[in-house]
Every structure is written in structure tokens, then in C-alpha cells.
Amino acid sequence: MVHIEGLDKLLHTHPFFDGMSEAMLETLAGCAANEVYQAGDMIFREGGDADKFYVLRQGTVAVEVAAPPRGKVQLQTLHEDDVLGWSWLVPPYRWTFDARAVTQSRLISLDAVCLRGKLDGDHELAYHLLRRFVGVMAERLHASRLQMMDVYAGPGPGREEL
């Protein structure tokens, strides 16, 4: 992966990395790259290799899941400063959702193999990064739960037939 000068500064200004030391940010930047997706582009697909995670710098991304027989269900919409992808942390390292750019989106990707290697050698960095990801995972779980309750709730008082 090519290290682009200044990615550590972009990471430094992103809220997800707030409070991390300059040394930690430089280490993370060594695994980082800029990526741009156009509206409609798939960033990743459920079941694919979870080989990165992303910080959203600009744009809108939909997190979706297949929900037969309804087709794709949008679980969450992510915007600037949101973090996308935690499946790179958990074997077998497969995406559990789809991610699609709704608008042109600029992201910083962080290579999972590079990151896991860095985290294995730096337990302080691992602690700081994993602590942040617990919040991301809890947020996705909550969003998934709410959306699934809505999708499968069926008709009831004040609800139309689906």
C-alpha cells in the first residue's frame, strides 16, 4: 500500500481517532489509502473478504442486508465522520453487510492485514483502536435490531399492511 503524505493529519482530524498519540496515528497512516466511490458503487458485499475498514470523509453510504423475500433492506445511512466496517476484526474476516455509496463518497481505507500486524505488536494501539470499535459494533447492532423489528413487525394498530 502506498503511504500518502498527510494521511496521518487527516486521521488526526477525524473524531474516531481523537485522543490517539501522533505515533499511533503515524502507525495507522502506514496502513491507509484514499478511496473515492461514485453514487451506486459497491464498497463491499456481504460474504466478501473483510480486508479493510473505512473512515468516511465526505458523502453518504448505505449499510444494507439481504432480507428475503423483501430484497435489500437499508439498516443505516452513514455520513461524514462515520466509520464503516468492523468485520476485519473477527475471524473469518467476512463482511456481514453490504455497503453502497449513495452519493460520491471519499473515504480513507485502512488495510486489515497491515492493521492486525501492527496491533499484534503494539498492545496500547490495539486497546485504543478496539475500544473505539466496540462503540461502532454496538451502534450497528442497535441499528440492525431497530430495522429488523420494523421490517418484520407486521401490521398492527396504526401500521399499514407491508
Describe each model-derived feature in a short phrase.
Residues 1-162:
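Cytosolic regulatory regions built on CNB/CRP/Popeye-like sensor folds
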